[in-house]
């Protein structure tokens, strides 16, 4: 077996694993020793790609669950990301980001980490310290709901209120805020607790804020009857679906992450 330390694709992509090879690291005989397991893994991945089935994979409630994360990079009418869903996100971006001055994302695990990584890569650590012109009109972005830290809730709220007060004192009117809770089940404790806290506190400050909400959750499964979905229906909030077969660590490549990317 030839381990040259690099895997190159025709597209130009190169995976360099040379730092993993060596006398006290991985050797060719180590790969040969687990070759049967590797072949089994390759067969299993091929099955996932073919029909979305992974033998023995169960959902949290113990029921068989499809696995569709391999389909996320491909945009097609029968995949999670369709031409229509991408256009819907683009339209939402134009409508919402252009009219909001602050956006707060609420999520935990994959519904938070992937979005935070996207934001840090494209906006950097000091985005919210930039002036509106430097942000090219895009809103300030905040994250919460990944823990139950009441002090963090209060300190971030104080900062948002402080900025809104300065804006109003300058005669520039109310601050328009978008709240975006992201939870597949619609019942995630940390996410819902943070969302409800900020929603109620900001709504109390009627002279300072105009508050809107967009909900990202499972609209077809059990979550469709969750209190969050019921609130979305009652208040006519815009919603985006989290479809089955995509776990939290991969959801950044579907609506939960793409809404941040948009």
Predicted regions, residues:
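Glycine-rich phosphate-binding loops that contact phosphosugars or nucleotide phosphates
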Residues: 98-262
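Extended, charge-enriched "interface" segments that sit outside catalytic cores
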Residues: 1-101
């Amino acid at each position: 077996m030839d381990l040259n330390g690099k895997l190159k694709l025709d597209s130009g992509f190169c995976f360099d694993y040379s730092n993993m090879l060596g006398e006290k690291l991985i050797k060719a005989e180590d790969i040969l020793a687990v070759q049967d397991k590797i072949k089994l893994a390759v067969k299993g991945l091929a099955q996932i790609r073919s029909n979305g089935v992974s033998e023995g994979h169960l959902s949290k409630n113990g029921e068989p669950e499809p696995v569709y994360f391999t389909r996320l990079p491909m945009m097609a009418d029968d995949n999670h990301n369709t031409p229509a869903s991408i256009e819907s996100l683009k339209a939402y971006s134009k409508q919402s980001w252009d009219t909001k001055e602050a956006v707060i994302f609420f999520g935990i695990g994959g519904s938070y980490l992937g979005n935070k990584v996207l934001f840090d890569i494209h906006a950097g650590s000091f985005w919210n310290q930039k002036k509106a012109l430097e942000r090219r009109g895009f809103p300030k972005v905040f994250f919460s709901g990944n823990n139950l830290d009441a002090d963090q809730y209060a300190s971030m709220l104080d900062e948002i209120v402080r900025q809104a007060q300065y804006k109003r004192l300058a005669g520039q009117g109310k601050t328009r805020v978008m709240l975006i809770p992201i939870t597949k089940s619609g019942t995630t404790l940390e996410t819902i607790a943070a969302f409800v806290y900020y929603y109620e506190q900001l709504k109390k400050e009627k002279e300072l804020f105009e508050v809107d909400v967009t909900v990202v959750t499972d609209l077809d499964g059990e979550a469709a009857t969750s209190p969050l979905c019921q609130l979305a229906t009652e208040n006519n909030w815009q919603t985006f679906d989290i479809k089955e077969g995509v776990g939290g660590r991969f959801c950044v490549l579907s609506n939960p992450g793409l809404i941040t990317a948009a």
